[in-house]
């Protein structure tokens, strides 16, 4: 499809890579990004709370037979010492799986949408490559990370061997994600897409929305970030939750419960009052600003939440 081809060329160019492949979802893009680098018995490293480890139905093991291993420091930064401890010192040691892939997330959901700095990204991807690992970046919200840093998509994903990002999150398209990498890797990924049932006919109508989003909705992500900070400030003044304001770098706000009460109960209270959020875990509320949330909505949500959470 001509429009799909145009979208793939545009995404690859913006990310500074040779090629790209359009897929229905971010999970599929991530799993293809794992499958091109790792196989049965290989070890794949990712943050213990990363989307790849906990929110993709065990795909790393189920689809590719790879062994996932969680790292505690690989959120919006990574302690390379932890990676050094995890990777076998001797690749010929038959007791250990072969270390193949490090997965990182930018922006990082578990830390509330925090962004990898250029220095951290260069340090970690460089060390991973020295250890013989490939690096896949789950960039579901890579556009948010780039806008927050004031850089390009290529700069926000520098050093990664493959990168996924979504059109249907902050960019506002109805559906679709993309995987970018070298031409050789994407050729392999296209075969994996077919196996996963992700090849689509007449997909130009949804690819067109992705193209529009890249051309018109990228810079406006700064508005979402500003609104998230305003909402975070309103929430921080309430009595039942606390918010780490410096951590609100993009469009995600995590509000930690001060009392021993279930987060889902507060989600229900807020929903009844007209504010929608989610329970990130048992003690944390998660608020996300996006294309459908304007200044008035943030003002109203802040006032209602402050009242409910007092």
What are these regions (language model features)?
Residues 1-258, 263-273, 278-293, 301-309:
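Conserved PLP-enzyme active-site core in the AAT-like
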């Amino acid at each position: 499809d001509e429009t799909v081809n145009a979208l793939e060329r545009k995404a690859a160019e913006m990310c500074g890579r040779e090629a790209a492949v359009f897929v229905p979802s971010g999970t599929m893009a991530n799993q293809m990004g794992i499958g091109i680098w790792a196989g049965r018995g290989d070890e794949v490293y990712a943050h213990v709370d990363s989307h790849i480890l906990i929110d993709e139905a065990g795909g790393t093991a189920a689809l590719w037979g790879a062994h996932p291993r969680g790292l505690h420091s690989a959120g919006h930064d990574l302690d390379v010492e932890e990676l050094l401890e995890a990777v076998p010192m001797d690749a010929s040691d038959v007791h250990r799986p072969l270390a193949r892939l490090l997965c990182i997330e930018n922006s990082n959901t578990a830390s509330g949408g925090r962004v990898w700095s250029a220095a951290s990204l260069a340090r970690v991807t460089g060390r991973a490559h020295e250890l013989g690992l490939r690096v896949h970046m789950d960039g579901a919200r890579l556009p948010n990370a780039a806008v927050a840093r004031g850089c390009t998509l290529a700069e926000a994903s520098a050093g990664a061997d493959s990168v996924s990002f979504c059109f249907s999150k902050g960019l506002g398209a109805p559906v679709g994600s993309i995987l970018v990498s070298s031409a050789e890797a994407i050729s392999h990924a296209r075969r994996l897409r077919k196996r996963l049932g992700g090849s689509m006919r007449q997909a130009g109508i949804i690819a067109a929305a992705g193209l529009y989003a890249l051309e018109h909705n990228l810079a406006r992500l700064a508005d979402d970030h500003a609104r998230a900070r305003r909402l975070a400030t309103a929430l921080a003044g309430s009595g039942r939750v606390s918010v780490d304001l410096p951590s609100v770098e993009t469009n995600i706000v995590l509000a930690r419960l001060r009392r021993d009460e279930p987060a889902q109960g507060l989600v229900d209270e807020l929903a009844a009052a007209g504010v929608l959020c989610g329970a990130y875990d048992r003690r944390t509320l998660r608020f996300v600003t996006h294309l459908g949330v304007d200044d008035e909505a943030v003002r109203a949500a802040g006032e209602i939440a402050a009242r409910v959470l007092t």
